[in-house]
Regions:
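Extracellular jelly-roll beta-sandwich "head" domains, especially the C-terminal globular C1q domain
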Residues: 1-132
Length: 132
């Protein structure tokens, strides 16, 4: 899904997220659905002792499509210690979300990766699974 709106330049915690072409929308789902998002990507740390967070920038929206809340949904951090510099690792972290309200069903979710040191990312694919 591609949407060219202010959401694609969303910011949270003082960090501006760019290169945001595409997001997930849940408007064909139902309150009570359980969603799993798996991101497959290769990551090459440029320095040892690098911590990487993978998740979604989640923006709930009201019935008029106004963003009501924006926050990050993250999973366990990935850590690359000594001896990992310059090596490429396949990652498949999973982030989950429970659609608890109509605002969640009308939400947009933008995949995001943040690292505390420079890394190379090669995106591969995503898998979005809905449990009812």
């Amino acid at each position: 899904f591609g949407e060219n709106t202010a959401y694609n330049a969303a910011s949270t915690s003082g960090t501006i997220f760019n290169a945001a072409t595409g997001s997930y929308r849940m408007d064909e789902l139902n309150v009570g659905d359980f969603c799993q998002f798996r991101f497959d990507f290769n990551l090459t740390p440029q320095f040892a002792n690098t911590t990487v967070e993978v998740g979604l920038i989640w923006a709930t929206r009201d019935a008029s499509n106004n963003v009501t809340f924006t926050f990050a949904l993250t999973g366990e951090p990935l850590f690359y210690g000594a001896g990992t510099t310059g090596q490429t690792f396949l990652n498949r972290p999973v982030t989950t979300a429970y659609l608890a309200s109509d605002e969640d069903v009308n939400a947009r979710a933008l995949p995001a990766i943040r690292a505390d040191q420079p890394v190379f990312i090669q995106p591969l694919t995503t898998l979005f699974t809905v449990g009812r």
